Amino acid sequence: MSDSIFEEDMTMPKAYIISSYRKISDPEKLAAYAKLAGPAIMAAGGRFLARGVAAKAMEDGRLDRTVIIEFDSLEAAMATYDSAPYQEALAALGNAVERDMRVVEGVA
């Protein structure tokens, strides 16, 4: 039991970047992006939780390539996205893919 009724759980919720690739028009550029993006994300503390084509689509789902990356916080996820190493990876990707990319905060 806590000694103080004023103590709060200061744990920040984790954040997840979720990318779903609707179309891959240049696999070589995607490979160049992956070679740069993976190390940039991991160096910033990101953890790949899932990566690959969906095993099954339900309701209106699609069998797209999907990537889920966990970060310790929303701020860490956004700092990684905005970082110079990740921006270099995005430049290598160019317009090689059409994807839906979003950041979702976890439940604290």
Regions of interest found by a model, annotated:
Residues 2-65, 72-82, 105-108:
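Short S/T/G/P-rich N-terminal loop/turn motif that feeds into the first structured element of a domain
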Residues 77-102:
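C-terminal structural segments of small proteins and small subunits
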